[in-house]
């Protein structure tokens, strides 16, 4: 059995730990922080807002928030991080000062009206480009009044931005979404003293009566990153894998459950349950069958590109529907998946809200074809999840990715661990 501690700290928790520390008034410690480009953007913005950040150990920081957030004399650069832009928008909406949030070309083309509308419901003064659809965003911090909001989309980023504004508003606010999204924000903030209640899917958020409690938080491994190696095991004959110290929040393991429904042998072993469930995941290769994914999309939206690779190895036609939000990620991920598969000669079809893929029962035929002619270069579209998903396919096919370096956005150790998996699995270790 291959045993991997993937050393890929959870991206969602790393962002939130930094941003939430700014609502405390005492130093906070974040251990095992994800040193990916996205999370480092959140850390740099915290510094630009006046926080003191000290490196106290490998991948560990002490963050001392300022008494009041500083109005920066420059644009707050989120680079490629949608989480940074959306959560900081909620935080800064009630802070004194003028704040401008911008990013790279990819981020500035992603939809931002989805957070501007709920923040404006509080009375927030926030503007975006092209009639509030896109960044850069300009925020003039101002007093907020409580509101009730029903979101048309299930998005943890939208929900988190709303909560951060609600904590600074006057009165009790409520938030409802049409499908459960990741709940790390609620869990973390409640543990730090925020009054957030969930009744039948409706969140009630009361304003903070005092600053959040200081914390010392160690971040577990990211299940979204771990999933790439669960996928590696699922498509590699005779392989068995143990993934250690993985965050097992129920809103984060839907992709593992989908892979399990496809036939992979997957078991969880919970090792601790303090703030969040953390444990190990056991995976064993087994023949895969086709799957239809149409529900709980918000809980596996990031893993759908990787699941598309599993679908290629499955018997039958697999389908993804109700996933239109894939078109609004770092790339149009529906188009990215389908165009790469079609370039490889794989039968697939693109829909407005998803795609279908006809699985190959015998991948060796495709491998033989590419032994006779050079396969097309896989296009990452500079999207880390597209690049890593198709990199897993190199376990079975002699492919090259045009820009695997973009994996550093969320998973700096990816290339090293993939090479390690190849070495151990093909050596029968």
From Swiss-Prot:
Compartments in which it is found: Cytoplasm
A molecular function GO annotation: 3-phosphoshikimate 1-carboxyvinyltransferase activity
A Pfam family matched in the record: EPSP_synthase
Upper taxonomic lineage: Bacteria, Pseudomonadati, Campylobacterota, Epsilonproteobacteria, Campylobacterales
Family annotation (SUPFAM superfamilies): EPT/RTPC-like (SSF55205)
Name of the protein described by the UniProt record: 3-phosphoshikimate 1-carboxyvinyltransferase
Sequence positions that bind phosphoenolpyruvate: 11, 82, 110, 157, 333, 385
Record field: catalytic activity: 3-phosphoshikimate + phosphoenolpyruvate = 5-O-(1-carboxyvinyl)-3-phosphoshikimate + phosphate
Subunit structure: Monomer.
Native species: Helicobacter pylori (strain Shi470)
Superkingdom of source: Bacteria
Family the UniProt entry places it in: Belongs to the EPSP synthase family.
UniProt cross-references to NCBIfam families, sorted A to Z: aroA (TIGR01356)
Residues that coordinate or bind 3-phosphoshikimate: 11-12, 16, 155, 157, 302, 329
